[in-house]
């Protein structure tokens, strides 16, 4: 069988923060190969699949991944040798069964995901298709709206801003290439605005600026100024999005925000105020991952006006997503393959979300690599949205550049999600 897995190798490498991660290379009988590198998050949900680290304080402060590498070279390779790489669902189920734990803690979700993605890439090469076409078929032609994280706070930056991400959303562009240009031009102007105000232009983990500001609203004001000075119309050409990462704000049942303790109802009232004053289309993790009652109330009050995204709430997990659907908590899901650990489970989460009328956003992590799989995945699944950072740092730009290549390859068949109303909006 030409597409049988013949060998698998793996290496400990570094991510964009200088922390260890791993890559896997899968080789098939016909000579096709697939390389995949896995990312790592800074603000992680409690219910994410387990990222296996060595725990040896003498190496990388315990963050090494040599155990995960050994799991790939040993039991995973033995299990998958001779299996057909074209049967992704079987490959992923074999990996899940081999691990045998609910959260992939024995082999490590990082080891499992690297092999899962590398297998798909090898299979795509074997049949002579780009990854997005191999995964998505003839209807893989929708280019996602990018949610560009240009101002950072929270766990992604060392500053006094509570909200983790302030994003540009170029909904008014005619193509992905134009959307990327919109964002890049505003990002350049934003740097000038910060310099004129004597504010820091140092960047956070995802490439956004991380200045010290008086309030979270001050960050939104900076974005509005930069959009206008770049020659665009806020709300028409470029809208805004937030990732609050409220888990990071929760202490003793209260949300500690701008120096005060707040209830879930207080936070929702605050978001209502922001929506009245700014063209915000999307709020991610506005409340904590176990505040289901708060999420239900927030969705009831705001869900008809804004996209309410569950990241830590759902962690790309089918069980948690189904609970959100059943309880009317959130109306969109952030999709991070490393939260769940296999390509098949990732696609299943997307399918469940779409069936329920939820929007889907394919996402990077704060600790990234030059791997561009999520760009192909966004097009393959017609997700309509992608989060992959700011307009600097090459591990972020790599994904944008891959989307440019895909759009060019599709030619006239390419459709930009923002142009046809498939980007972020209320249900």
UniProtKB/Swiss-Prot annotation:
Subcellular location per the Swiss-Prot or TrEMBL entry = Cytoplasm; Secreted; Cell surface
**Among the entry's GO cellular component annotations, what is one?**
extracellular region
Residues annotated for (2R)-2-phosphoglycerate binding in this entry: 164, 336, 365-366, 387
GO BP terms: glycolytic process
Positions bound to Mg(2+): 243, 284, 311
The cofactor note reads: Binds a second Mg(2+) ion via substrate during catalysis.
The catalytic activity, as recorded, is: (2R)-2-phosphoglycerate = phosphoenolpyruvate + H2O
Question: Active site located where?
Answer: 206, 336
Q: Which NCBIfam families match?
A: eno (TIGR01060)
**Biological function:** Catalyzes the reversible conversion of 2-phosphoglycerate (2-PG) into phosphoenolpyruvate (PEP). It is essential for the degradation of carbohydrates via glycolysis.
Q: What is this protein called?
A: Enolase
Origin species, per record, is Synechococcus sp. (strain JA-2-3B'a(2-13)) (Cyanobacteria bacterium Yellowstone B-Prime)
Could you read off the lineage of the organism from its UniProt record?
Bacteria, Bacillati, Cyanobacteriota, Cyanophyceae, Synechococcales
Q: Which gene encodes it?
A: eno
């Amino acid at each position: 069988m030409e597409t049988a897995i013949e060998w698998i190798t793996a290496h400990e490498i570094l991510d964009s923060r200088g922390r260890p991660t791993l890559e896997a290379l899968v080789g098939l009988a016909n000579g096709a190969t697939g390389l995949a590198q896995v990312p790592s998050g800074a603000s992680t949900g409690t219910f994410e699949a387990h990222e296996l680290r060595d725990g040896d304080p003498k190496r990388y402060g315990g963050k090494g991944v040599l155990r995960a590498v050994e799991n790939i070279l040993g039991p995973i390779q033995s299990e998958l040798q001779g299996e057909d790489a074209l049967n992704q669902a079987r490959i992923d189920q074999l990996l899940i069964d081999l691990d045998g734990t609910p959260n992939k803690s024995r082999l490590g979700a990082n080891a499992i995901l690297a092999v899962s993605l590398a297998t798909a890439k090898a299979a795509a090469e074997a049949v002579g298709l780009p990854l997005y076409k191999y995964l998505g078929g003839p209807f893989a032609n929708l280019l996602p709206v990018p949610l560009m994280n240009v101002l950072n706070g929270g766990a992604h930056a060392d500053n006094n801003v509570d909200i983790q991400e302030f994003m540009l959303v170029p909904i008014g562009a005619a193509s992905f290439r134009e959307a990327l240009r919109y964002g890049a031009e505003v990002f350049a102007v934003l740097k000038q605005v910060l310099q004129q105000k004597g504010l820091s232009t140092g960047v956070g983990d995802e490439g956004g600026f991380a200045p010290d500001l008086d309030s979270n609203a001050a960050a939104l004001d900076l974005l509005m100024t930069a959009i206008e000075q770049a020659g665009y119309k806020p709300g028409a050409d470029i809208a805004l999005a937030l990732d609050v990462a409220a888990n990071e704000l929760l202490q003793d049942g209260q949300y500690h925000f701008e120096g005060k303790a707040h209830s879930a109802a207080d936070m929702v009232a605050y978001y209502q105020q922001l929506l009245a004053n700014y063209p915000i289309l999307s709020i991610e993790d506005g409340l904590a991952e176990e505040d289901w009652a708060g999420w239900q109330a927030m969705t009831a009050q705001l869900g008809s006006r804004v996209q309410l995204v569950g990241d830590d709430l759902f962690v790309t997990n089918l069980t948690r997503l189904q609970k959100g659907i059943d309880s009317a908590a959130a109306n969109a899901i952030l999709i991070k393959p490393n939260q769940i650990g296999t390509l098949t489970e990732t696609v299943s989460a997307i399918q469940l979300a779409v069936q329920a009328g939820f929007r889907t956003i394919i996402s990077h992590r704060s600790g990234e690599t030059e791997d561009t799989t999520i760009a192909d995945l966004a097009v393959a699944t017609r997700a309509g949205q992608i989060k992959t950072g700011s307009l600097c740092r090459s591990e972020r730009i790599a994904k944008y550049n891959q989307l440019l290549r895909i759009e060019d390859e599709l030619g006239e068949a390419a459709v930009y999600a923002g142009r046809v109303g498939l980007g972020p909006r209320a249900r």
